[in-house]
Amino acid sequence: MTDYLTSGEGASKPGYLVLLRHGQTAWSVSGQYTGRTDVPLNEEGRRQALEGGKRLRGAFPDGFGRGHIFSSPLRRARETAQLAGYSDFETLDDLMEWDYGPAEGRRREEVGAVLGHDWCVWDEGPEVLPARMQGDWVCTLPDSGKVDVHSGAGETVDEAAARARRVIGKVTPLMLAGHNVLLVAHAHILRIVTTQWLRADPHSGRFLRLDTAHHSVLGYYKDDPVIIHWNI
């Protein structure tokens, strides 16, 4: 852990909050919004999860204690945790990806075509999308696997941020007790978790890039919540 210790006067003693994004899926390749649909990792995603686990073990050779690893219940996150070598996890519904509502399973261009203008989830959220876009269907993946897609009303960025704050509220006592905590989840919700850790506007998560199967580290410096490392 010495690589991650802050140094100098005011260096903090609490543990670190480590964020690990899941590996690649067919929909992360195609650009389809993947919120609550239970898309599995593809072959490349499984390879990425193995490699991501190696990097994470190199950074945290002592690992994470029992009760200090949390995963989204969605398959792509659970598979990543297991392949990365962190199978002793607790699932948290609050770590599920942002619910994109009517945009679920669609590409950004498709959503824009319905609205008649470019759409950005950070700017407008799912709440501006028409109810006629909602529905249920079955999507066939490139490997011929099938996933059930549910496209409901979705959630606002503020609702996603409220979930993120609940996660932070759960892990903060563990960190203050000196434990390192690992969260395995999804790009948007982990970026929103980061904004709430920094006490920032959740919309500012758009300025953080977190690649598949990469990790980031949050912590304290002089009692302030900070980003220690990003997108490793």
Q: Which positions does each model-derived feature cover?
A:
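Short glycine/proline- and acidic residue-enriched helix-loop micro-motifs
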Residues: 116-159
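Active-site signature of alpha/beta-hydrolase-fold catalytic machinery across serine-
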Residues: 83, 192, 196
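Beta-strand elements within well-structured catalytic alpha/beta cores of enzymes
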Residues: 15-21, 70, 179-189
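Short hydrophobic/aromatic-enriched beta-strand-loop microsegments
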Residues: 40, 87-94, 201-210
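Acidic, low-complexity terminal tails and accessory targeting/binding regions
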Residues: 1-16, 52, 98-110, 173, ...
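Glycine-rich phosphate-binding loop signature in dinucleotide/nucleotide-binding domains
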Residues: 59-65, 171-180
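Loop-to-helix element that buttresses phosphate recognition and phosphoryl-transfer chemistry
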Residues: 18-83, 150-165
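Phosphate-coordination/substrate-recognition cap region in phosphate-metabolizing enzymes
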Residues: 3-12, 51-120, 124-131
